[in-house]
């Protein structure tokens, strides 16, 4: 394993193909400009790797200029390592910076081993800094600290160090400027600074790392107990002068929050951007030079000056799963201590395959990384290939979070089946928690790896009592325009219809159980996963239930449900009806 590189941290004071954006060089000042020219620093931007050690099963769609798009097979740690190495080559001054969600919501080959191999892969890639994302907290902050520091202390159901008996932790640094402990300190350092060169050619790059303020609503509360997640812009603005005072010539923000360009927007330009990050950036100190973002799983390279002329920084994001990287070149004037120019482009990490697209570069597999991934793949194979049942056909995961699918209904049916003994009448599953399709093998065979990919979080099931009026209020929360709009997948016998054209709070048109309208005064036993039970995804009504009973883990429920029949028929859709515009 590579040795830990020297990192300089600042103390907290007072507590696609070749889509490019380029910032024009600053005007030269003959009295102050170094005749040797600017110092070049290369940065590779990553985000939302999610433990995808192996190439994604499905190709990614790469939007092009003119409204066209191409499907490209991309990703895989061995190919990403090769791409990172290629884009760091040719210069002594380089950094690799990630904007969070390196771990969590991961495929079996990483998640089965508590994402230790995802950390190991990033070590081998030469990652320097990672701004923590919400998924870094999926197993709790203590387990996240273990991933940083190493060791084999157990913080959950699974035993650490199953493959690497001396797991040493991350060679790179986690950054969390807006995550504060009860003691008033940040959970991880908020900033770091990296210096290059010497004498008159010395330059320094300061980095601020942080996650989205809404993280507590996206993870199990026990995992972030005792932590406060502060305002993102305030955290950035408090640290910009610190970095400037420490001699930073360029300031980079890595933040796990993102923009939402219009669907089909090419990777270059801002387009009609939306998303929570925009409002944050409109409040950020203009002295920031570069923002590496994530969370929305979108790809873009945006000159934010086209949105707000007072803020001339570039904002980037490289999709998800290691399928892209952002190549960034900073030209720093060491005499004026400023960024003279900045160029950035997103690169598709096309892997070696039978149907490689000649329009995109192909990256060969890095041999050392391939061997490392193979070690974990072999260790996971016995568990992942174990048959757990059969289904009648392919079951795809939801596209939009409001889409009803047979897979979502299958999961809800399995959860209802597993909790009947607790009196369950209804099961509700959040579509955002369904992470992959289930594509059966020969004869309809489904493996443990298949169901794990679809539900990778290991949530337990909880059954509680709710009044009919609470249940209706819960259904309304799905459609609250102030939050993330998604509909539940629901179990057999339960149905509801909604109309987004109606006023907020009255968008549920009807709801019924076994054909009978929900009675606001009656009591109903409802099953949900432990994430929802704690108010996850903003569903606070779930917390108001009574007479709670804890059930099995969601994967065990699915396995038991599939085992009850030789072949389980996929349930029909039609339980959730969108009446908007009808």
Regions found by a protein language model. Give the residues of each.
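Short alpha-helical segments used as structural interaction elements across diverse proteins
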Residues: 1-2, 236
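Non-catalytic terminal accessory segments
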Residues: 2, 7, 20-38, 44, ...
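Sec-dependent N-terminal signal peptides
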Residues: 8-14
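C-terminal motif of bacterial Sec signal peptides marking the signal peptidase cleavage site
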Residues: 16-18
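Acidic, metal/ion-coordinating pockets
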Residues: 20-354, 402, 406-417, 427, ...
């Amino acid at each position: 394993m590579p040795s830990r590189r020297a990192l300089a941290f600042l103390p907290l004071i007072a507590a696609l193909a070749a889509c490019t954006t380029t910032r024009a060089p600053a005007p030269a000042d003959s009295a102050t400009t170094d005749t040797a020219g600017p110092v070049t620093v290369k940065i590779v931007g990553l985000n939302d790797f999610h433990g995808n050690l192996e190439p994604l099963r499905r190709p990614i769609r790469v939007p092009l200029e003119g409204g066209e798009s191409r499907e490209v097979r991309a990703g895989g740690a061995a190919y990403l390592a090769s791409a990172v190495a290629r884009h760091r080559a040719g210069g002594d001054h380089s950094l690799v910076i990630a904007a969070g969600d390196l771990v969590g919501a991961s495929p079996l080959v990483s998640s089965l081993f508590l994402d230790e191999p995802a950390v190991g892969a990033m070590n081998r890639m030469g990652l320097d800094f990672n701004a923590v994302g919400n998924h870094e907290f999926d197993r709790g902050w203590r387990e996240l600290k273990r991933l940083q520091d190493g060791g084999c202390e157990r913080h959950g159901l699974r035993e650490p160090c199953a493959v690497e008996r001396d797991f040493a932790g991350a060679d790179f640094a986690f950054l969390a400027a807006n995550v504060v402990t009860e003691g008033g300190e940040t959970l991880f350092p908020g900033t770091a600074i990296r210096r290059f060169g010497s004498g008159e050619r010395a330059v320094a790059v300061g980095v601020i790392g942080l996650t989205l303020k809404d993280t507590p609503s996206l993870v199990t509360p026990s995992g972030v107990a005792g932590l406060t997640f502060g305002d993102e812009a305030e955290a950035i603005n408090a640290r910009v002068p610190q970095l400037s005072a420490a001699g930073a010539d360029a300031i980079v923000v890595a933040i796990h929050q993102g923009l939402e360009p219009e669907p089909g927007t090419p990777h270059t330009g801002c387009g009609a951007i939306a998303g929570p990050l925009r409002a944050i950036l409109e409040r950020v100190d203009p002295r920031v030079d570069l923002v590496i973002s994530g969370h929305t799983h979108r790809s873009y390279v945006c000159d934010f000056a086209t949105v707000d002329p007072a803020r001339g920084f570039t904002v980037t994001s490289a999709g998800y799963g290691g399928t892209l990287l952002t190549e960034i070149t900073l030209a720093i004037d060491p005499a004026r201590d400023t960024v003279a120019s900045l160029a950035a482009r997103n690169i598709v990490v096309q892997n070696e395959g039978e149907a490689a697209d000649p329009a995109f570069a192909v990256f060969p597999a890095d041999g050392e990384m391939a061997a490392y991934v193979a070690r974990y793949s072999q260790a996971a194979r016995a568990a992942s290939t174990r048959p757990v049942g059969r289904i009648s056909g392919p079951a795809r995961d939801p596209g939009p979070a409001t889409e009803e699918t047979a897979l979502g209904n299958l999961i809800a049916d399995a959860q209802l089946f597993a909790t009947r003994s607790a009196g369950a009448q209804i099961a509700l599953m959040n579509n955002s928690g369904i992470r992959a399709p289930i594509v059966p093998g020969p004869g309809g065979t489904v493996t443990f790896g298949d169901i794990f990919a679809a539900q990778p979080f290991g949530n337990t099931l909880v059954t509680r009592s709710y009044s009919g009026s609470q249940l209706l209020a819960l259904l309304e929360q799905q459609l609250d325009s102030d939050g993330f709009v998604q509909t539940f997948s629901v179990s057999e016998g339960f149905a509801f219809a909604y109309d987004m054209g109606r006023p907020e709070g009255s968008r549920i048109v009807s709801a019924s159980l076994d054909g009978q309208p929900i009675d606001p005064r009656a009591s109903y036993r409802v099953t949900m996963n432990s994430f929802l039970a704690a108010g996850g995804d903003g569903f606070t009504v779930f917390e108001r239930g009574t007479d709670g009973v804890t059930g099995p883990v969601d994967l065990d429920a699915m396995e038991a449900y599939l085992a009850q029949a030789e072949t389980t028929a996929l349930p029909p859709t039609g339980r959730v009806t969108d009446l908007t515009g009808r």
